[in-house]
Amino acid sequence: MTQTFIPGKDAALEDSIARFQQKLTDLGFNIEEASWLNPVPHVWSVHIRDKDCALCFTNGKGATKKAALASALGEYFERLSTNYFFADFWLGETIANGPFVHYPNEKWFPLTENDELPEGILDARLRAFYDLENELTGSMLIDLQSGNEDRGICALPFTRQSDEQTVYIPMNIVGNLYVSNGMSAGNTRNEARVQGLSEVFERHIKNRIIAESISLPEIPADVLARYPGVVESIAKLEAEGFPIFAYDGSLGGKYPVICVVLFNPANGTCFASFGAHPDFGVALERTVTELLQGRSLKDLDVFTPPTFDDEEVAEHTNLETHFIDSSGLISWDMFKQDADYPFVDWSFAGTTEEEFATLMAIFNAEDQEVYIADYEHLGVYACRIIVPGMSDIYPAEDLWLANNSMGAHLRETLLALPGSEWDKEDYLNLIAQLDEEGHDDFTRVRELLGLATGKDNGWYTLRIGELKAMLALAGGDLDQALAWTEWTMEFNQSVFSAERTNYYRCLQTLLLLSQEDDREPLQYLNAFVRMYGADAVEAASAALSGEEPFYGLQAVDSDLKAFPAHQSLLNAYEKLQKAKAAYWSK
């Protein structure tokens, strides 16, 4: 068999692919290659997914088909090993009370009487970083996955690299602030760690360049010429009408970062891609392949025009948008003729062991502490790297302003609403409670509760604002019900099925009619049936009377059996739990 070795990898692509695929099969995962893209020469991307659980999927990119597949499989192990596929979901009562929730080496810290942070979690540096004003309480740090307040705070062990000491970091903090940043899997420990550290640099320097509107030096043509595959990819993009800028993002040779920007003159927009790796050529190739990962050439019209409003560019919400899908704003200043830094023909390359040491030296020089959690329970090395102040995707204040577990106490109540028979006043009190707790009207209820609902029911599109319409109907407050119904039609209609949209049109009409004291409703019944259909009129009438206000929502028990999508997620997680238990019992 042919052996293909590429820079930065400690095994042949063929060996990695065969090993990863066999391990996934052994673990019981049924993976398929769902789609491939090869929009320009030397740029491939692939989407792989679990046939049994649609929520488990990854994308891979590379200069060849094999490199892209190895990339996707590596990312799959990264997300399985770190439990990232399950980061947004409640795992149910059984797992919450099982021997372990995340890993057998997790540690639980009971909540204290005064709700202060318990002794033993975090170190002094982390406490100062996450809780400078002493506003953080223990109950804020219950993890979404278990939601088990009786058990306390679940914290995971990370190794502090400066002294190899174990530090316990709450899963709640990891999930809320770092999401997928700094996660990696690889053929060897050093290969994966280099990738994870490179990603931290890539995202941090990207944010700095964008936020500070730094103008970067272009990579000279003679340097680009060393990488003919990249040159051919760029030439094809330019021939298709997309001007390309290739920049040195190292900020004077300090960081292993490249930036490539694509212009789309057809609609006046631009898109900046960043990549990082100790090897200049690897970083450049990654940046170009990232530019088109999961995109064909006709998908390059969804970005934003450059702007002179540098304040808006620097806003945290804009940087978050860049992290999610790179569609945020870019300043025109990035493209100034006179760069803020000189071009440096940098190289931090060596063996993966040397590269890890080199990257760690950069963090040390900046007095940045690095925390690493290693995972080998699936037979593939993976890690999660945290560098507070550099690898955070969201600010520490999100722990109390936008914590992913802030709706956990509502889960049982909201899931029981369909079929409930409360006093009318109690439904209206729940609206008041949602307001008092500061839940955004646009928040999807399934995300607030950590549920995989599937797309075939009303829970999938339900937002807090629509829920308020239902609660107002149940509480008999028709004025409030009309206001929230109209909110729902304005802000949620685009994601509704035709049937649900028609129901809300009918409901709005009946609510408006209810305000007309001098009109007799029966006079309009025939016209309403002709306009909206008998089913919609019947459903809207039942909502108006308070009999059936929760249209399209089925009652859900604590086992979540009503949601097959959530069950498939739990089945996938159970496979991982078995592998963890077996590995840690050795």
Segments the model singles out, each with a brief description of its role:
Residues M1-K586:
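Helix-biased "structured C-terminal domain" signature
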